[in-house]
Structure formats: C-alpha cells, structure tokens
C-alpha cells in the first residue's frame, strides 16, 4: 500500500533555515569557482568522468543495495537515497587537500555535480520514492523541484562566480573566510535538526547509523578501487574516493524538507554528516600512513 506524504507543520523551522543556509553555502561555492574549473575537464576528461560516473551512478546503486539488504524502514531508506543523490560538498575539497589529493579535480567534480543536481537529485529521489511505494502529494512535480532547487543552488553559484569575476583579487584573498562561514552554516542546519527533534534523534540514529556507516565506508572503498583501475594517478584516486564519501548534507536536508514533512527522512543525512567526517579523517590517516 503506497504511503502518502504531504508537507505539514512538523518541519516548519528547518524548512525556513535549510534553503537560506544552502543558498549562502552555494554562493560561497560560486565565489571559489572560475571558468577554468569547468574547462579543466577537457584537459583530463577520463579522471573527471570516472569520478562523475562513480558519484552519480554507483553511489545511488550502492545506497539502494544497503537499504534493501538491511530492510530499512521506508523513510530511512528514502533518506539514504537522498543523501546518496546529493552532490559532493565543499568539505570534500578541503579534505582532498589534507589527503594530498587532486584538489583541482575535486573542485571541478563538486562544481559540475552541484549544478547538475537540479536534474539528478529530483530524478533519483522521486524514482526512489516510487520504488519504495511512497506517493508524493506535495503538489510539486519533478520540474517544480528542479526549479526550486535552481533558485537555491544554481543561481547562487552563478552569482558567486560573477562576483568573483568582478573582484577576483579581493575574493581570492578572502576565500578562507568564506569557507569558514559556509562551515558554520552547515553546523547551523544540523544543530537545528538536533534541537527540533532532541527527544527522538537517538532513536532515529539507531535506525540509520549502521546504514549510513556501511554506505559511507563501502562507497569510499569502491570508488578508490574503481579510480585505481581507470584514473591517471594516486592523487586522483584519493580525490574521487573522498568526493564519493563526503556529500552536501545541507542540500540533502533542503530536498527532504521540500518533499517530505517527517523528520525521519532527514535522519540519514544528519547521521551521515556526523559519520562522514570521522571516516573521512580516518581514511586520510590510512592514506598518509600507507604513503
């Protein structure tokens, strides 16, 4: 029997916070981008497309497999698909630098997958909902979701790039401050979720924690070995593994609030946001030791 999900009052505060914070984070991403981050793809297309393929196709497939094998509750399963559909976050660029990975490739992957997310994310999420028997009745179509995402994802990125183009020297000198601000915005979103659902959050984490841990670790390992076979070197391997393990959690929360009202749909994102930093730094430590 299909479940019917409609927008309600339960997530009212996070629905206000998430789009504002996401728009500011994407503006910050745009401030750090230039045309060369896109044209660079032409100089090493194989490295880019291995990362692109791993993130947009392999990651959702692995997430679906985890959801089915663990027989997750429907909201948790769909929440897992939402975080898998999300593009890489700005954090992946920072951790790639710590890992001595290919930062330029990381930035290009983040930029392109973020801009394409207005198409890829609604497609994956809506089809996942249909697969798990959830009927979305929010009076919003896939096109409507894409348009709303464009307002808080694509438009801020483009504005940020325009601002950088007009004042490149000034923006370049302040980019570290911008990155710190976006980091705090990310924290604000997840603090709001924890505060809003403080009575239930640990029950939710108990349901989602194992699933997101398996997804995160298995995907970084899979991506690392796919990259090992196809890309040009170890720095590119590190980059692609981290891109597939560090997702844009704020975007995932925004999509969850746009389509669903139950907090359970946000929980995998909240759990993933905690776990991905721990596993990410452990992964970097292992890479450094192996070097």
Spans of features found by a protein language model:
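Alpha-helical transmembrane segments of multi-pass small-molecule/ion transporters
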Residues: 1-291
